[in-house]
Every structure is written in C-alpha cells, then in structure tokens.
Amino acid sequence: MTVDPLIQSLKGKLVVSVQAYMGEPLRTPETMAQMSRACELGGAAIRCQGLADIAAIKGRCEVPVIGLWKDGHEGVYITPTLRHARACVAAGADIVAIDATDRPRPDGKSVEDTFRPLHEEGVLLMADCATIEDIRRAVDMGFDLVSTTLSHGVAAIDCTMADGPDLPLL
C-alpha cells in the first residue's frame, strides 16, 4: 500500500484542533488563522471546523489542514454529507474529516456512500470514529487516517465530554 506523502508527513506529528464556536470570544476566522499559525510555528498540523476557518487558515499556514464542517449538534454532525465534504475541499482542506460511524446520516446515505465518491476523486479522508468497529470498517474501506474523535460516547449526543474519553479504545 502506498501512503500519500501528505499523510506520511503527519506521522509522529501533533495535530492541534483549532476551533471556537459562536458566542465564544475567539470566534473569528482571522483569530483561528492566527492561532493556527502559532501552532504551526510549534510544529503542529491543524484540524479546524467551518469553511471560513479552513480558507483563512490555508491562507496563513503551510502545514496540512484537516478540515471539517459541523452541522448541528446531534447524530451525524461532523461533515455529514458529500456536499459538506466537497465544500471543505473547495475551501482548501488538505484532508477532510467525516463521521465514520454507522449511525444514520441526514441525507440517508451510508458512510460508504459518502466515502466512495470522495475517495475516487482523490480526496484524502480522516474517519472520525466512536468504536473499534468503526475503526476496522474505516480501515477496510480505505480511509487515509482514523481518529477516535467520537470515542467519548456523549459526543455522539451533545458534543460534551462529561464521561471522558474511552481509554481502552485509545
């Protein structure tokens, strides 16, 4: 199996999630870009949320940018559809993170139906997973990276970490 050079460049590297939400004091694309630049100077790659942030960060940083689009707060909300993923690519994401759980997606498609066309288009994809089964399925499908982003069970419901991470999975 050949590993994409961009994916290889992340091996052993810290990836910092640079995200702020509506109503938070740092919530501007320019601030996210400045924070990302500081992370880049420290040697980290970036994971960010939202089309404006992806574009602003790509305009300021040279490290790989993992982009995603959070739509809502319940169910599958991390880059939930093909349309969301393609918009992240258009905004400049080097890698697109999508929810790779087997939960129902808002467009009624399976994760495989979302993954396949993107993979065929050459989009590098990160699988955001909740369980070891999600990880195995993502690897079998051919995702470029996997993440345990959704492993803190509550995240699938309301975006909190009240129960903490699933340490055995990690």
Predicted features by range, described:
Residues 1-90, 138-140:
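Conserved N-terminal beta1-alpha1 strand-loop-helix module at the mouth
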Residues 15, 45-49, 66, 97, ...:
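Conserved beta-strand positions in the central sheet of alpha/beta enzyme cores
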Residues 26-29, 47-66, 75-83, 100-118, ...:
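Active-site-adjacent beta->alpha loops and helix N-cap segments on the catalytic face
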Residues 35-42, 96, 117-122:
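Short, surface-exposed connector motifs at secondary-structure boundaries
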Residues 61-65, 91-95, 119-122, 140-147, ...:
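Glycine-enriched alpha-helix->loop->beta-strand junction motifs that scaffold or abut catalytic
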Residues 89, 98-99:
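Extended substrate/RNA-proximal surfaces in nucleic-acid metabolism proteins
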